């Protein structure tokens, strides 16, 4: 074993997985209790601000676009101290939830505050998604990353369920709005605990070349799109990820669909927590058996089942009951849980370390742009309770996503070397003309010439090999000693020639 790897393994925390679970569990619980996708839309609907409820998720997506754009620059400054960055992110999210709980919930002013804090929360989430994905990709092997995300979701859901069922009834002694205030305050407390737990995670063992080299934001996106154009696996990944954005919006859609029912908020919060617990156990087994393809296909089918249940319940006049909208919301929650975990498992294995943060940033930005447009559309049509065609739209999008999931890779296998760079796919190996190796050292001009280098390599590989008896080569050749095999010229040779530098030539081959 190399000494560098031995030092890294010795310096890594022994219970790193448990510390990451604790940090992510508190973060998940805090976001559930102060969720801008479930809690704030229901509060706006109860206050009669239906227009604000439909604009909350688009505001979040706009902030996420800005956060994704700023994330490479922030990661460059953070370096290996990602645990401090995650602590700052948790503290900022807690401050935003406190603002939502402290502002008076009267008039149009509360809608403006909710929209502003939701947009700022999108910025925080955009930075957090890229930073956390890159951090766990460096700290954990490929087979543990999806398990970590599902375990964090389960731990956070259990905590949020216990708080909602036990602590909130003990604290709330007023009307329904008093309970909503308590939910937000407890959500802020969970985010503070997440920030404290992040301090014990420790710094990263290594940082990728892309994040260590400071580059302008324009060049970062130019490099990301150049790689996307030249790498078929990333185009396939990005197309599938964009088609699954409506699945991620399922929780917001069905929460707005059930917002008119009295007492629906606590039911939705509890069911979202239960859904994450059930989904954690379900998706972990599916991930081990069927890989990313099974995760995405199961997610699309569950979302389609939720839409079908909603259509049947509304047609029969049963949607106002808790069992109807609660079951549909539970299915949508389980379906949306695995979209992020599947995308992280997909891209963290295939993306080289030097390009990982850039590709995650580009993919998250495109997904946020689509979520902004779809969020406005779905948030508006979800509140049309008198018609059933909005649910038909959701069902159609789920069927399209299910078909697209068949192109995803299956099980992910890891070789004897469990480092992130050694992770490989068993059933899906992309064949590219000029694959990008993770051990290369690049400069900003190389990033800008990825596409040109790919085309030059393909062109040179199809050209016939140059003749070996060129005058320039004959003058530079050395005659071998009698009885010894000839050696190739020490000058670098193109891989298309078929002879490696310094490799012995065949006995019947002429000397150049």
Curated annotation (Swiss-Prot):
Keywords: Cell membrane, Membrane, Transmembrane, Transmembrane helix. The chain crosses the membrane at residues 25-45, 55-75, 96-116, 123-143, 148-168, 183-203, 238-258, 263-283, 294-314, 329-349, 359-379, 386-406. It is found in: Cell membrane. Its main location: membrane. InterPro entries: MFS_trans_sf (IPR036259). GO terms for cellular component: plasma membrane. Residues 428-512 are annotated as: Disordered. This is Uncharacterized protein Mb2232. It comes from Mycobacterium bovis (strain ATCC BAA-935 / AF2122/97).
